[in-house]
Amino acid sequence: MNSNSTIGRTTLGESDTISLSFSEPSSSLNSRSTDVVFASTSTLVPQQGSLTSLPPVSSTATPTYYSTSLTYDETLHTSIDVSSTSTLVSSTDSSSSSEQDTYSSQYDPATSSYSIITPSMSIFSSTSPMSSSSSITSEWSSLTSTTPTLSSSATSLSSSWSSLSSPSSLLVSSSLSLSLSSSYSDTKLFSFDSRSSIFSPSTPTVISPSYTYLSSISATSFQISTTSELSSSWFSTISSPSTTSNKDTTFPSSSRNTSTSFYSSSLSSTNDFSTISKSSKLSPSASSSTVSISTISVPTSSSVSSSSSKVPSNRPSSSSSSDDTTSAYSSTYTFQSLQSTTSSSIPPTTQTPSTSTISTSPIPTSSQVFNTVAISSSEDSKTIYYFYTQTYDITDSSTTFVTGLPTTIAVAKSEVTSFSAPSSTITADMSFYQHWLDGSLDNNKNQGTSKTNTGTIVGSVVGSVGGILICVLVVWFMLVRKRKAKRHFKENDSFCHEIGRRTGFPTTAQAKEASLQAQDSGSQQRNTETASANNPFSNEFNFKARGNPPPVPPPRNVTAMNGSFQNMRSNFMDQENRFSYGSSFTYSSLGSSTQGGFSTLSSNSIRLGRGLDNDISHDERNTVQNNSQGFLREII
């Protein structure tokens, strides 16, 4: 019989401050954190006819690691201030006669701030991909009978990864400010030589970093190789002491873990480095952490929780209990991994052994394959209704399961003689399944969709034909209008209509009409004669209406003109060939036509120009031909 008693209750306030500073030129090797990308697939198969059945979980995860290494040889003056404050609010101790003590404490939110100032720094960085592949397989089997039976399960986990990076160059400017704030409670249970701890954060941790770097780097390299192996096995014995449905199951188990880490780095440094630091170390048994992840999906529910602690214990334990309807088991694996030290010019930090505890709660298998489809029918005067179960593959981002949903199809009697249900599986999303559960899924939406599609097709065809006709009419109208415009331009703007207009008189066609009207009546003839005095083109083709030629003018006295004419002839004879018309009408022809005292045309032939007449010698003619050219030579 155990008796419990409370020892005491205390309220303490604790404050811890860490400060690091150095201001000498330094050279160091830096490695950034690793980014991990997981690609996982899980499958849930529910039981037919039940939306809350418990299907098995099969999960495969393939993570990919991307590591960025920073290597730099820096010459800088850096100051680092680190402060951390934690306050113990309450503490309670209790003990029992079975030599078991319970200790619990609660802390208020703790805040840690880091400030790093680096005036000048050059960074050569390179990114090297690291690949990792891990597989977790969970097997579960059970057999229930009145005699003792055996149920076994095995879980194995293995992973390995390696990395090799090479430097590259990068020049950036940054500064770093990091703040961490969280509030947590701590509960401890310990007895004799074992101790466990659970750390549950009540508020999320807030980290706000900002970087400013300006550095100069030398090339370095490092290599990481890690091999991890986890194996476990256990056996169970099931006993049925009575005919009742409850059963007790105990799983003794053993686990084994092997972890190997290798880390090597090299760097070159030519500067001295000094560090003045003050730090506080928390023992491995003083804190622990628990991370819980809960996943709920329709129509099944499952929960997975994992916890990690720093308790250096390697004694696993497991227990299980089951009844007729549900079964679950819980296993705890404890393994310890050691990390190797770092080789660099910076003093290495203290490596703390870490221990991880994984707790899983899988659910029993439940699978159903829809091989046979039962069809029932109902009919009225015109329609036959078929009822059957359609297989659906419901797929979501985190869940995939197969289920059967009742489906109804209405077919006219005149269109079908026999009916067979489709055997293929239809793939749908979770929203479809949710609508089916809510009763808001319209089974006749396909018929409405077909009618809508028919109307859309008819409207598209009619619109296309109408659009083509409208385009043809517009093109025809433009062509007709252009043809009329060309015809109007030919009638009004042709060359024949411009002949009379350029002299200020009507066109030739109007003159023809006027001459014909003048021949019909005397009055019109008089009007035409009056108009002909002003318009020389009015009687152009009326030869009968033309009058007699004008009388010959009286003769002129040319005696006094002979002297002046000879002078004028001699003065202008040299310039007679300046123009082309001088060769066809010369003063010699003018003189011959005016010697008789009349101004009429002479009967002599036209003079060809000086040097071409018959009254000059052959030598003079050649000389004149060489000095000037006449009208005929110009034409040739």
UniProtKB/Swiss-Prot annotation:
It is found in: Vacuole membrane. The chain crosses the membrane at residues 457-477. The modification Phosphoserine is found at S628. Residues 1-18, 510-541 have a biased composition (Polar residues). The keyword Membrane applies. It comes from the Eukaryota. There is a cross-link at K512 (Glycyl lysine isopeptide (Lys-Gly) (interchain with G-Cter in ubiquitin)). It is a single-pass membrane protein. GO terms for cellular component: vacuolar membrane. Signal peptide: none annotated. Residues 19-33, 87-108 have a biased composition (Low complexity). Glycans are attached at N4, N257, N492, N557, N562, N626. Residues 1-33, 87-109, 238-271, 299-326, 339-362, 510-551 are annotated as: Disordered. Belongs to the TDA7 family. This is Topoisomerase I damage affected protein 7. The lineage of its organism: Eukaryota, Fungi, Dikarya, Ascomycota, Saccharomycotina.
